[in-house]
Every structure is written in C-alpha cells, then in structure tokens.
C-alpha cells in the first residue's frame, strides 16, 4: 500500500503534507518523500527509507518552504526499499516530480524510450 497527499494553497505546504503522511501511516510503508515548490520555483525534494518521523527529521535540517507540494509513502512492489526507489521520482532535469500508486504496466517500454532520448535513471522503479 502507499499513501499520496498533495496541497496547493496560501499556507506553508510542508506541515500539511507531513500531517497527511502521519495520518496515512496505518496503511503500512517502507519509505517516504516530499517535494515542495517555493515561490521562486525552486523545489525542495527529500526522500528517505523508513518512517515519516525520519523524513520529518531530515526536513527539519533543511529549509523547505512553499505553498504547493506532494508527498508519498511507499510499500515496495518493484525494487527494494531504498532512498533511490522512494517517491517522489523526478526527471533527470529536476523539472517533473511524480508519485504513483501501483504498477505502471508499460514501464519497460517507457524506460527504453526515455533511455534512447538520453535520460538517466536513478531508481529500479
């Protein structure tokens, strides 16, 4: 199982996203991550293998601010539990951040096409 939460509004996104992840903990998971977009367009992106409290500790050491974000808890169906396989995933230019729940059936085709275009993958999922 996994949990996905997002926020867009006038308040700081991070506390809302973390609260949502804490509320989803009962579903079970092996890793967690968050991406928050700041007003200048920069993205704070943190992932960890482990609990939401570990993610919160990593975030406390960084300045991740913004009013738009997405967060995810993951239970591995493909790839081992690791920081690299935790969501949000990003493209190699750090311009697109993606979370998903489940299996992307055509992942091999998509991966092959993106590799041909020169993209670099950092995860097994």
Where are these regions (language model features)?
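Conserved short alpha-helical segments that host acidic/polar catalytic motifs at enzyme active sites
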Residues: 1-125
């Amino acid at each position: 199982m996994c949990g996905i939460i997002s926020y867009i509004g006038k308040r700081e996104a991070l506390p809302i996203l973390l609260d949502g992840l804490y509320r989803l903990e009962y579903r079970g998971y092996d890793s967690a991550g968050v991406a928050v977009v700041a007003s200048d367009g920069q993205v704070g992106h943190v992932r960890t293998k482990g609990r939401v409290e570990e993610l919160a500790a990593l975030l406390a050491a960084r300045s991740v601010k913004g009013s738009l974000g997405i967060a995810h808890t993951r239970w591995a169906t493909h790839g081992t539990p690791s920081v690299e396989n935790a969501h949000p995933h990003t493209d190699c230019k750090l311009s697109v951040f993606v979370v998903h729940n489940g299996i992307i059936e055509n992942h091999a085709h998509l991966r092959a096409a993106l590799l041909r275009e020169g993209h670099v993958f950092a995860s097994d999922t």
